[in-house]
Amino acid sequence: MTTLTAQQIACVYAWLAQLFSRELDDEQLTQIASAQMAEWFSLLKNEPPLTAAVNELENRIATLTVRDDARLELAADFCGLFLMTDKQAALPYASAYKQDEQEIKRLLVEAGMETSGNFNEPADHLAIYLELLSHLHFSLGEGTVPARRIDSLRQKTLTALWQWLPEFVARCRQYDSFGFYAALSQLLLVLVECDHQNR
């Protein structure tokens, strides 16, 4: 990635963490279809690797705006994909993909972070990885901690996430019949891949 700043990448990770952590409420549903989000998506589409994924997400959002009971239907999709058994779901936990669930805890300690008591999910939840990446990108932009140290931790986090993210995304694509979370996860996959290559 060349044109997005560290803060912009941090914002994308934070936004994705929020969308993967809980069902969308009415306010979030309105926000994702807003003119402000359209501007944000335009900025992301300036990065060629992200263009197709952002276009697909925008298509899903456009379809969502005409879907009857959109919030309830999307909540059902969220529940079916992320909260049920793993037989026909895409569980958002590293441990569901036979990865070391302690790795994220070690990374959080190294970053001087801990999980919030308000987030009632295990530490190996996808949203925790994304919050950590957001924090690290914000830290890169601030320049208060040596960039080499932050970048090393960012690479470790990206490597740990990449161990299971492709399978998670494949399952989202397989089991999300409406396609909003499939498109969202595809955008995440491309973002992480670009971030990982940007050493």
Swiss-Prot record:
Subcellular location: Cytoplasm
Keyword Cytoplasm: yes
Residue stretches in coiled coil: none
Family annotation (InterPro entries): Chaperone_TorD, DMSO/NO3_reduct_chaperone, HscB_C_sf, TorD-like_sf, TorD/DmsD_chaperones
Major site of localization recorded for this protein: cytoplasm
GO biological process terms on file: protein complex oligomerization; protein folding
Pfam families from the UniProt entry: Nitrate_red_del
Key words of the record: Chaperone, Cytoplasm
GO cellular-component term (any): cytoplasm
NCBIfam families: PRK04976.1 (NF003442)
Purpose: Involved in the biogenesis of TorA. Acts on TorA before the insertion of the molybdenum cofactor and, as a result, probably favors a conformation of the apoenzyme that is competent for acquiring the cofactor.
Protein family membership: Belongs to the TorD/DmsD family. TorD subfamily.
PANTHER family for the chain: CHAPERONE PROTEIN TORD, CHAPERONE PROTEIN YCDY
Protein name: Chaperone protein TorD
Species name: Escherichia coli (strain K12 / DH10B)
Gene name per UniProt: torD
